[in-house]
Amino acid sequence: MDHSNREKDDRQRTTKTMAQRNTHCSRPSGTSTSSGVLMVGPNFRVGKKIGCGNFGELRLGKNLYTNEYVAIKLEPIKSRAPQLHLEYRFYKQLGSAGEGLPQVYYFGPCGKYNAMVLELLGPSLEDLFDLCDRTFTLKTVLMIAIQLLSRMEYVHSKNLIYRDVKPENFLIGRQGNKKEHVIHIIDFGLAKEYIDPETKKHIPYREHKSLTGTARYMSINTHLGKEQSRRDDLEALGHMFMYFLRGSLPWQGLKADTLKERYQKIGDTKRSTPIEALCENFPEEMMTYLRYVRRLDFFEKPDYEYLRNLFTDLFERKGYTFDYAYDWVGRPIPTPVGSVHVDSGASAITRESHTHRDRPSQQQPLRNQPRSLTAEWFVLAPLSHPPAPT
């Protein structure tokens, strides 16, 4: 389920990561200059460690030619189930034309590691949710939702399903950058081609699949062991939107003796929670969205424009202006290269062996072991305050 085989809340796991990340990562040995500076490729200097997990570690880096900061993801070459090259391949498949995707600058060996150099982004929606006292206004959620429907439509247009919806995987741009207001989608380690590249046909419907995704947000059909398709990404987004509006979901914090029992309880609670109850006291459009995506057929192409219009029409009816004045605008946001105060004016201008996770599972054997952090979240903007318990 999460990149973790231990059933813990996302925030609990992240807390543990912060305490342990300096002891569980081996030191990568890459190309060093005569002065001992570690390099990736010809021009990326490897800096401080800002995250780690079973995949390897994450480093802040710098492009010595442009003086720009970057994120460097390192994975041992001898990993039993390497995923970094697959993720790189998916990024290349997605291309650089789509809005809200990090640029990938380099992939190649770095001593005993493979390295992927990515655009350095800002904090995740989970970080920003914490910063805003764990509640977002309807305006902010709608601005997020409208963008993420376009992100997911683009991913699907490239014959990929994402299968990893969670707030930690959606990041804003770096402050001061022209894309600072754009919600980006990252971490394609669990993505999958739903169109067979050989036959050009949709993958077949299957059952008895192991869980892939994050339990809190994944679709009901994923809990039931059904093969995922485009509909499941959209349902998971709907659950995340309600998480932002409500502050929590009814299936959070359930207790059980085993992981399997807990995941079963989460799925059972999702199925038994009427959409009307989940969306109570919120606009009817939230119910309409969830009803629509849950009724989609496995092979069916969602009507993304219909869903976007649900939210844009509501947005306009409420009299909102799409000015990117999110709830976090005006609050200081720590980043790996210093704390930045978000100015409101400036902001307005502008693979098949995964098992369970309540953050995503990472491997088999690697993907099914605990991954102790949300990868780029730490790279791109580790907040200094500890997560609150849930």
Curated annotation (Swiss-Prot):
Keyword Transferase on entry: yes
GO terms, biological process: endocytosis; positive regulation of canonical Wnt signaling pathway; signal transduction; Wnt signaling pathway
Residues modified as Phosphoserine: 344
Record keywords, A-Z: ATP-binding, Cytoplasm, Kinase, Nucleotide-binding, Phosphoprotein, Serine/threonine-protein kinase, Transferase, Wnt signaling pathway
Biased composition, class Polar residues, residue ranges: 15-34
Description of post-translational modifications: Autophosphorylated.
Keyword DNA damage: no
Domain Protein kinase intervals: 44-315
PROSITE patterns: PROTEIN_KINASE_ATP, PROTEIN_KINASE_DOM, PROTEIN_KINASE_ST
Subcellular location: Cytoplasm
SMART domains: S_TKc
Catalytic activity: L-seryl-[protein] + ATP = O-phospho-L-seryl-[protein] + ADP + H(+); L-threonyl-[protein] + ATP = O-phospho-L-threonyl-[protein] + ADP + H(+)
One function term, GO molecular function aspect: protein serine/threonine kinase activity
Domain of life: Eukaryota
Main location: cytoplasm
Pfam families with a match to the protein in the record: CK1gamma_C, Pkinase
GO cellular component entries: cytoplasm; nucleus; plasma membrane
Region (Disordered): 1-34
Enzyme Commission designation: 2.7.11.1
Enzyme class, first EC level, given as a word: transferase
CDD domains referenced in this protein's UniProt entry, alphabetically: STKc_CK1_gamma
Residue ranges crossing the lipid bilayer per the database entry: none
Chain's role: Serine/threonine-protein kinase. Casein kinases are operationally defined by their preferential utilization of acidic proteins such as caseins as substrates. It can phosphorylate a large number of proteins. Participates in Wnt signaling. Regulates fast synaptic transmission mediated by glutamate. Phosphorylates CLSPN.
Subunit (UniProt): Monomer.
Name assigned to this protein: Casein kinase I isoform gamma-1
Species: Rattus norvegicus (Rat)
